[in-house]
Every structure is written in structure tokens, then in C-alpha cells.
Amino acid sequence: MPKFYCDYCDTYLTHDSPSVRKTHCSGRKHKENVKDYYQKWMEEQAQSLIDKTTAAFQQGKIPPTPFAAPPAGSAMIPPPPSLGGPPRPGMMPAPPMAGPPMMPMMGPPPPGMMPVGHGPGMRPPMGAHMPMMPGPPMMRPPTRPMMLQSRPGMARPDR
């Protein structure tokens, strides 16, 4: 009878049947071994990419970044005022572009505030209403016309 070999666990199962494989693959040790295998594989891929990028940069195939430090002995061109930085002599300081950075909201919003929307692929919270679908506005059911008042006590009678 053939045996089933698990590459992740480096072991043979007692026999090759779907129930034995299913039981093995749902086990804690097997899942940990699979996770470790792919984690090591990702680390190797990242290191390989870093090594290739470093080698290409050292060979001059990748130009230095435009805002890197200038080579020694060359004059540095000041950045335009729109990029910020300290004001230069004789120049007005640039106005701040925006307020302080927003802190991510932790927990539920304050009472009375509803979240604006949901991220792509996210479900709305329990009890929340689904957003309206785009399309023509819905018709209201017919009602009696409202009475308009021009001044207090002066009501137009309903016709």
C-alpha cells in the first residue's frame, strides 16, 4: 500500500487515504509547518530582491534618487518654497499646507456621529443601514398639500 509523504512536515502518513490526509492537514503541527515554510520562502524572496537591487545600484544601473544628499564638493540647489523647509534669507516662510496630522480613530465614533462609509470589501457594522443604490430618486406616497402660512394667524384655507 502506498504511503503519503508530507513535504511540509517531512514525514510519511500511515497510508494514503483522503481521510488520513484531511486529518493530517487540519492538524496544528502541519499548519505551523506550512506557515513556517511560506514565511521562510517570503524572507528568501525579499532578501533576493534586496541583493539584486543592491547589485544593480552598485553597477550604476539604478540612478540615485533625486532628493538624495548631493555629492561632496557640489553646490546644493535649494528646494522650491512649495516643498517646505526652513525659510531662506530675504524670503517669507511658506504657509503651512495643512493642520496637524489626523490620529486614526480608535473604537466607535462619538454618539450622534455615524461613519461616512466602509472600505472596499468591508461589511457594514451590525445594525447599520446599507447605502442607497445609485438611480432615480424614489417617489413619495401622495399626501394632502401642506397649508402655507404667510403670517401667524393668517392661514390659507385648503381648497
UniProtKB/Swiss-Prot annotation:
* UniProt keyword annotations, A-Z: Metal-binding, Nucleus, Ribonucleoprotein, RNA-binding, Zinc, Zinc-finger
Top-rank lineage group of the source organism: Eukaryota
Its subcellular locations are: Nucleus
InterPro entries, alphabetized:
Matrin/U1-C_Znf_C2H2, Matrin/U1-like-C_Znf_C2H2, U1-CZ_Znf_C2H2, U1_snRNP-C, Znf_C2H2_sf
Its cellular-component GO annotations read: commitment complex; U1 snRNP; U2-type prespliceosome
Residue ranges of the Matrin-type zinc fingers? 4-36
GO biological process terms, alphabetically, are:
mRNA 5'-splice site recognition; spliceosomal snRNP assembly
Positions of the UniProt region annotated as Disordered = 63-95, 139-159
Primary location class:
nucleus
Show the ranges annotated as biased composition (Pro residues). 77-95
- A molecular function GO annotation: zinc ion binding
What job does the chain carry out?
Component of the spliceosomal U1 snRNP, which is essential for recognition of the pre-mRNA 5' splice-site and the subsequent assembly of the spliceosome. SNRPC/U1-C is directly involved in initial 5' splice-site recognition for both constitutive and regulated alternative splicing. The interaction with the 5' splice-site seems to precede base-pairing between the pre-mRNA and the U1 snRNA. Stimulates commitment or early (E) complex formation by stabilizing the base pairing of the 5' end of the U1 snRNA and the 5' splice-site region.
| Quaternary data | Component of the U1 snRNP. The U1 snRNP is composed of the U1 snRNA and the 7 core Sm proteins snrpb, snrpd1, snrpd2, snrpd3, snrpe, snrpf and snrpg that assemble in a heptameric protein ring on the Sm site of the small nuclear RNA to form the core snRNP, and at least 3 U1 snRNP-specific proteins snrnp70/U1-70K, snrpa/U1-A and snrpc/U1-C. snrpc/U1-C interacts with U1 snRNA and the 5' splice-site region of the pre-mRNA.
Q: Give the family this protein belongs to, as stated in its UniProt record.
A: Belongs to the U1 small nuclear ribonucleoprotein C family.
Name the chain's protein: U1 small nuclear ribonucleoprotein C
Question: Which species is this UniProt entry from?
Answer: Xenopus laevis
Taxonomic lineage: Eukaryota, Metazoa, Chordata, Craniata, Vertebrata
Gene encoding the protein: snrpc
